[in-house]
Curated annotation (Swiss-Prot):
Protein name (record): Multicopper oxidase mco
Compartments where located: Cytoplasm
Primary site of residence: cytoplasm
Cofactor binding summary note: Binds 4 Cu cations per monomer.
Residues annotated for Cu cation 2 binding in this entry: 109, 147, 430
Positions of Cu cation 3 binding: 149, 380, 428
Top-level taxonomy: Bacteria, Bacillati, Bacillota, Bacilli, Bacillales
Keywords: Copper, Cytoplasm, Metal-binding, Oxidoreductase
Region annotation (Disordered) ranges: 1-29
Family listed: Belongs to the multicopper oxidase family.
PANTHER family: BILIRUBIN OXIDASE (PTHR48267:SF1), CUPREDOXIN SUPERFAMILY PROTEIN (PTHR48267)
Amino acid sequence: MMNMKEDKKNTMDMTNMKHHDERKKLNSSQGKNEIIFPEVAESKKDNNGYKNYTLKAQKGKTEFYKNNFSNTLGYNGNLLGPTLKLKKGDKVKIKLINNLDENTTFHWHGLEVNGKVDGGPSQVIKPGKEKTIKFEVNQDSATLWYHPHPSPNTAKQVYNGLSGLLYIEDSKKNNYPSNYGKNDLPIIIQDKTFVSKKLNYSKTKDEDGTQGDTVLVNGIVNPKLTAKEEKIRLRLLNGSNARDLNLKLSNNQSFEYIASDGGQLKNAKKLKEINLAPSERKEIVIDLSKMKGEKVSLVDNDKTVILPISNKEKSSNKSNTPKVSKKIKLEGMNDNVTINGNKFDPNRIDFTQKLNQKEVWEIENVKDKMGGMKHPFHIHGTQFKVLSVDGEKPPKDMRGKKDVISLEPGQKAKIEVVFKNTGTYMFHCHILEHEDNGMMGQIKVTN
């Protein structure tokens, strides 16, 4: 029989223990930074009909707060990973590369595949090693995700940035928004704690589930979303280590709940709130056209603002441009600058183009976690025509023949490019220090 002293001691121990379901206070987003959306992963189809992808788990640095860089992890970049868009019936081949200093795996959360390629703890890829997996997609449309699953370091690797989305695209016609990054929006919600404005998992780790005091959406601190006055589809992932979310709109308006973890519902449901456990996904459609002029936010049940949403009117000044043949992504600041994720290599030809052939290039100044900076983009050996900026007709001072276009963070332009001579030409940012730091590429023009 337990004596009185033991009983008193155990009672005190239980009193001092933190309850497993206790919620750490989460601070509201101040809505200072526009969210950015993960890039869509590019694939190449081989002669056997497989869509080929490459995913690298790698180390990086992320500027969550101005002039404060955190050590982070990402897939094919500094933080998070690209979105893989698949369809039912696709045959898929993915080269998985571990560029970390520790073991990792690549787990396809929610994907129905053979256990040999599921990416569980037994399917370790060691540092510096790689392997290729194959599978066929046998599921209907759904929002899934991928993340590491190495024992015992899953929590640490996910917290530090290893997460990405995987769509199985709509196979049946429906009226749901489907323009990725415009009205079909991936929303990865996470909570983290920053120590002196830097990530430090070891100092914030909790064995009963690490919860943070700062909300991030798609890796952005103090996020906000600006969207047109139309229906928008939010593909919500609770990518937190341990925090449950109970999401609703701040104006208490209802929305359509259209899909759960495994895919679309037979019939959409009108709801005013949804629960999201860690790793859970749900899709909702919000009709912003019915909320003109309103300040609305996606909030957690304790009124914590997760994502302020502001409306912008539909633009009537759209510019119709031909199909894009080349995409240029300008990224970074200081010496962390790249074009399409690459530093300049004199032995690498990035693009080719035929002599006298008109092509449309899309130039994007990718906004980073702190907003980024303006980049003047220059092409050697040609004068180009600016067709559009952010989908609209270019401003008057961007018309006429040009060889430099300067883009603000987040801006995207389409330009018409024709080369009248053959040879190898440079394209680069014309901030000279950025050029010297590798923000440059090469195009070869041939007959």
